């Protein structure tokens, strides 16, 4: 890669985040379906690269156990099983043959090195993989602190007052990475309380006192009824209502790579 520190979108909630000499992958899913075996929503867009093409990865972050985030085929075939794995409580059992698996409770932090610390924080979400395991494993967000830069990886989440509390304790945040798609589930209900709309994502970032907000979790799988390309349009159009310049409400194209320096530029 060209940059010492960068963020690259592979698709959905899968990102490669390079911070100095450390490469992080998030919620990686490379399967064609977001479900068990061959079932579940099919991909609308292919991942930016194949699993065997990803660069050497040092840290693997998993936010929760839903099929579009915890993809067992990808976990089994992940080429870097010596990576440090950070997962919510009770999800470590899925990472057989991995050498360094760390289950985390909310507000628990792990120091990676002298320049990098990762804290697991609450999210407005839930967990489930079968008919009998609803909310039996934890879920959450990851706060990545690299030198003097704070990146909050918030996916999946709905809107809640918890973000004002997080903003007071950990803010201001430099970059909030948050879901902006999969919110329209009519006729069951008008919108998901567990997935922010583009406007709610901006509200979360506002509560966090975030400088930049990067919208994700759209354009990859058809998970709900809104037009698949609607989220980034609404996200950009409504930025100023929540105190952001349009240029600070950021979306990538799948496969796009941007240096941390360019993302943070005023």
Predicted regions span which residues?
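Active-site metal-binding loops of divalent metal-dependent hydrolases
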Residues: 28-30, 65, 123-124, 155-157, ...
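Catalytic core of the metallo-beta-lactamase
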Residues: 14-20, 112-174, 192-200
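Glycine/Thr-rich phosphate-binding loops of Rossmann-like dinucleotide-binding domains
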Residues: 34, 70, 95, 128, ...
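Cap/insert and terminal regions of metallo-dependent hydrolase folds
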Residues: 54, 59, 84-86, 90-93, ...
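Metal-dependent catalytic neighborhoods of phosphoester/phosphodiester hydrolases
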Residues: 71-80, 223-233, 261-262
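Metallo-beta-lactamase
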Residues: 4, 84-149, 234-256, 260-264
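Pre-active-site segment of Zn-dependent metallo-hydrolases
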Residues: 1-4, 10, 14-62, 72-77, ...
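Divalent metal-coordination and catalytic microenvironments
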Residues: 17, 27, 64, 71, ...
């Amino acid at each position: 890669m060209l940059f010492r520190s960068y963020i690259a979108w592979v698709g959905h909630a899968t990102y490669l985040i390079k911070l100095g000499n450390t490469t992080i992958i998030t919620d990686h899913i490379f399967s064609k379906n977001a479900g068990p075996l061959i079932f579940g929503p099919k991909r609308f867009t292919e991942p930016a690269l194949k699993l065997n093409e990803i660069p050497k990865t040092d840290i693997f972050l998993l936010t929760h156990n839903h099929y579009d985030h915890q993809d067992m085929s990808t976990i089994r075939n992940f080429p870097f099983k010596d990576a440090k794995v950070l997962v919510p409580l009770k999800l470590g059992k899925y990472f057989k043959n991995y050498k360094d698996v760390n289950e985390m409770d909310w507000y628990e932090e792990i120091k990676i090195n002298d320049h990098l610390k990762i804290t697991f924080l609450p999210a407005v979400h839930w967990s489930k993989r079968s008919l009998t395991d609803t909310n039996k494993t934890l879920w959450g967000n990851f706060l990545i602190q690299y030198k003097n830069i704070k990146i909050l990886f918030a996916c999946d989440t709905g809107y809640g007052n918890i973000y004002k509390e997080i903003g007071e304790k950990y803010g201001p945040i430099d970059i909030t990475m948050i879901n902006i798609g999969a919110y329209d589930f009519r006729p069951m209900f008008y919108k998901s309380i567990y997935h922010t709309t583009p406007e709610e994502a901006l509200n979360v970032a506002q509560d966090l006192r975030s400088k930049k907000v990067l919208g994700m979790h759209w354009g990859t799988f058809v998970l709900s009824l809104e037009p698949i390309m609607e989220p980034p349009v609404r996200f950009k159009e409504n930025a100023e209502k929540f105190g952001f310049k349009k240029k600070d409400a950021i979306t990538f194209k799948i496969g796009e790579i941007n240096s941390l320096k360019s993302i943070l530029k005023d």
